């Protein structure tokens, strides 16, 4: 009986040792560069392509819009935009990514927080008209807190570009045509 127990332990120990080893990319004690290299080495081309995809929450009018359905969402996608009002759904989607994807890579949740989230502030062009970077810092600080509390990881802002052509559709997201003012307001935003 004793020999059988020793044999069982000898067979079981190597198996337990292998099972307890985490992949390098999951080891927070390793340098980031090494973790990234390890993760990229493990990823298939398909997984890498899906990490570059951003699906949209809301209308279900094209294949990259999930509507309000989670079941058809690939677990390996990189990010999802416009989901900030339902923490249960966000957690369900994140759990799907972590548990159903092969490598357990979490999804980034993004939203356009260019001039506030729950509290809406004047557009960037109007903020620049105030010539008050401190006020911009205060407003953006509140927007940042609201974003964190809403589970948003990625805010797509500020938009630091110099407005050159008034026909451009996103000119209102700029801080204007003066590079110095754009720089000051951009620094205040960040």
Indicate residue ranges for each PLM-predicted region:
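N-terminal beta-rich core of secreted/periplasmic extracellular enzymes
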Residues: 21-190
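Bacterial Sec-dependent N-terminal signal peptides
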Residues: 1-23
């Amino acid at each position: 009986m004793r020999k059988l127990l020793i044999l069982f332990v000898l067979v079981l120990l190597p198996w337990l040792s292998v099972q307890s080893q985490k992949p390098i990319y999951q080891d927070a004690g390793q340098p980031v560069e090494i973790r990234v290299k390890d993760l990229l080495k493990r990823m298939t081309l398909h997984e890498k392509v899906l990490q570059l995809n951003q699906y949209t929450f809301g209308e279900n009018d094209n294949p990259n819009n999930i509507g309000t359905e989670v079941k058809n969402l690939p677990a390996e996608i990189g990010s999802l935009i416009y989901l900030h009002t339902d923490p249960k759904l966000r957690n369900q989607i994140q759990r799907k990514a972590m548990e159903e994807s092969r490598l357990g890579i979490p999804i980034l949740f993004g939203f356009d927080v260019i001039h506030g989230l729950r509290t809406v502030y004047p557009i960037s062009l109007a903020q620049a008209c105030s010539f008050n970077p401190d006020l911009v810092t205060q407003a953006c600080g509140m927007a940042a807190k609201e974003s964190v509390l809403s589970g948003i990881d990625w805010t797509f802002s500020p938009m630091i570009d110099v407005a050159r052509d008034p026909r451009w559709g996103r000119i209102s997201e700029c801080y204007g045509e003066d590079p110095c003012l754009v720089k000051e307001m951009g620094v205040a935003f960040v």
